[in-house]
């Protein structure tokens, strides 16, 4: 799916399930094993993987209680707060957000019918998986941060934290676990 018409069709189908519905919460995962964090979208803050959940269900590497609650919100026509990046784009620019682009990827869109009928409590095994074993990295990608990049940590230790106007968590503080 690449055309503007396809994008509009995808957005309309997503909105027919719920105004905040995004397939990425089911079909995509990034797992940061070194820090025990996970997320399904690079725009949201990574959250901890509960070790008690994991002991009961290895699928909790992706299907955390936190994600299941967010999925329920999406299926109940709600807009999860953690997805505000997409809401700001959709509400203030009239543009299509990553909610649509991530959902229309072939590894996501093919599961639309199945996922749209779920309750949010089910385990769903992702089609797109990224695994990070530590924060050792030779790059300082702007969307990453020191928790996931040793080069970011080194730069912040040398020059101090970045001053971001709209970031309100300790995103750019050095990773003290090193």
Q: What are the residue ranges of the model-derived segments?
A:
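Accessory C-terminal segments flanking Radical SAM cores
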Residues: 3-106, 125
């Amino acid at each position: 799916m690449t055309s503007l018409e396809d994008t509009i069709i995808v957005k309309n189908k997503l909105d027919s399930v719920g105004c905040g519905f995004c397939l990425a919460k089911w079909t995509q995962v990034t797992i940061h094993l070194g820090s025990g964090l996970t997320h399904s979208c690079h725009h949201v803050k990574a959250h901890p993987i509960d070790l008690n959940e994991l002991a009961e269900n290895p699928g909790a590497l992706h299907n955390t209680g936190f994600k299941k609650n967010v999925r329920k919100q999406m299926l109940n026509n709600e807009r999860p707060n953690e997805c505000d990046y997409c809401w700001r784009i959709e509400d203030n620019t009239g543009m299509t957000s990553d909610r649509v682009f991530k959902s229309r990827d072939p590894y996501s869109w093919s599961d639309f019918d199945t996922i749209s009928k779920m309750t949010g409590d089910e385990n769903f095994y992702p089609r797109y998986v990224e695994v990070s074993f530590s924060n050792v990295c030779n790059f300082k990608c702007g969307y990453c941060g020191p928790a996931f990049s040793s080069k970011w940590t080194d730069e912040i230790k040398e020059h101090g934290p970045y001053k971001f106007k709209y970031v309100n968590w300790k995103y750019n503080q050095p990773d003290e676990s090193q």
